[in-house]
Each structure stands twice: as C-alpha cells, then as structure tokens.
Amino acid sequence: MAKYKIAWLPGDGIGKDVLNAAKIVLDELKLDAEYIPGDIGWKFWCKEGNALPQRTIELLKKTDCSLFGAITSKPKEEAEAELDLSLKGKGYVYTSPIVKLRQLFNLRTNLRPCKAYPGNPLNYRDDIDLVVFRENTEDLYSGVEFHPLPKEVMDVLLKNHKSMKKFENTSLDDIAVSLRIVTRKACQNIVRDAFEYAKKHKRRSVTVVEKPNVIRETSGLMIREARKIAREYPGIPLWETNIDAMCMWLIKNPQDYDILVTSNMFGDIVSDLCAQLVGGLGFACSGNIGDDYAVFEPTHGSAPKYAGMNKVNPIATLLSVKLMLDWLSESQMATRLENAIATVIKEGKVRTYDMGGSSTTTQVAEEVARKL
C-alpha cells in the first residue's frame, strides 16, 4: 500500500500536459504515492452543471493532498450559454471549482513563492526572492453577490450606512453588489502563517499589503491584526504598504522585499505581478494550504489554444510539486527537485518557447528528471 494518496486533477486545457510532466519527475523521485484521477473542469460544467462534481469532493476526502493542472473559468453569461441544452434554464450557476475547493476544505493560505533562478532570460532581476501569502477563502471571493440588488438588501443598506444615499434613486436592476467579507480569524491566520514561515526560513521581513486609507474597515482590520501579531516576532520587522504603492515599489525595487501578506483579491493581483518579475506564469507555483489538506497548482490558466500541443513551460507545475513534497515532509526530495530545476534553468540548453527555446513540455520534464 502506497504511503500517500494524491488526487490527480488535470482539469482543462494544458492541465493534462503539465501534469504529465509532473508525473515524469515524480516517477524519477520514486515518491511512494498512488495517484488517483478526479473529474474537475469545464466539460463537467457543460455536461453536468457542476465543474466540481460531488464524487470528486468525496475522492479528495480520501486523499492526502491534490495536484491540480489548470481550469477554464468564464463569466456568468458565457458559462450559461455553454451548458448542455438539457440543463439550460434549470438554475445552474457556474462557480470556479478551485475557489469552491478552497472554501470547502478551508484551504485558507495561498502560498506563492516567486524566485528568480539564475540563467532565466526572463528574470526582471536575478536577486528577487519573494513569497506571497494570500488569504484564500474570504474577501471579494466569498461569493456573496447581488444583481439585481434585492429591495430588502437595499433597505438595510440605506438604513445602516449614509454612503448608500448616493444610490437611493438608482434602479435596483442597475446596481450590482459584491461584499468584501474579512474576518478577524482569517486575518490572524494568514499573518501568523507569514510570520511563522519567516521565522522558519530566516527571512528578512514581512510586509502587509492593504488599502486602509480608503477601504477603512476591512483593510483596517487586517492592518490592526498584523500589528498585534508582529509583536510576537520581535526579530522580524513588519512593514505596511498600500496595494497601489506596493505595485510601484515591486517594479522599482523588488529586491528590497521578502514576504508579502495580504487579503484575497490584492493577493491575486500582486502575486501575478511578482510572477512576471521572475519569468511569468510559467514559473509561478502555488499551494492552497489548510490545517489538514492542501491543493498544489501552477497559477497559470488553461491556455486552451496550446492544449495537447506539448508546448508550454512545465516549471510552474514542477515547482508546485516541490511545494507539495515540502508539505508532505519529504524535504530531501523537495530540495533535490528544486536543485534539478535550478540547474536546468541555469544551463539553458532545454527551454520552452516562452524562454526563447523550442523544447517541448516533456523534454523539459525529462531534463529535470535526468538532473535528479
């Protein structure tokens, strides 16, 4: 019986291509694991009205963690238009399966390392080593949205907040509302995770990234909790930066920053910016981590035009495997894998098209496997 059970979730588009690359490396590492395929993605939305079928949720409950490829996600109207004819008009509403997974399994911490590996021609600078901690279950991604705005909701808002007076005479059909929900507990958890990581890995600083000068209540709560928790880690300085200024400073002086911690939407934005500084989404790995379960994935999309072409850069996926190995306490394997990836990048002999080369997804994975 295998030591680990890992849910294998290719998803959409290039998801299968990059997970095939991951399997080449995992086989070479000889991780004692059983890989169990699960249904997830756009075709299941179209055929079943659910991109994350209940059978897949039950599968995940029986596994140690998941490795996830990529997902196609479309706006409400487009999603409804692509439903099977037999499902149309029956009240099905598309929800991103990865967002749903994060909430169902309380995968509260989104860990996104963005490190410049020497030899990567796409590096903005070679001395960038950032780690983004993004709260993963709340904020504008909580899914509490209204359109049109129900009259009873409008009445409550008008009664309780003077700023709603501006919209008093606007037709309810002309108002869309998405609630930014932030809880004290979630703020505490993500900030503490960031500081614990900084302590364990001997990092220089933690920067909390918010917008409390405008979004006073929700961003303000995050800032206040960050200040409290920072007192428990006197050797690690806490910096505070507004999200707009953070984007500017990351372009100007990315080497000055170390660990960034923020709420869900700001984290989604700033982590993609950080990824571009170290080569783009082809190098952007992530872990969605909870107390007893985790899902690891590259942060790129499904890139359907490249699906099945064996063309895309698998390094983001291979680095996600590295994060998975760390989480499984297979630290030696994780270090070997990262060193092999770094060597392949530095040598520059095997590169996919985004790096100016012509190697295939498989060839990059095989070269990494050889370096193991």
Predicted regions mapped to residue ranges:
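Buried hydrophobic packing segments
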Residues: 22, 26, 226, 317-325, ...
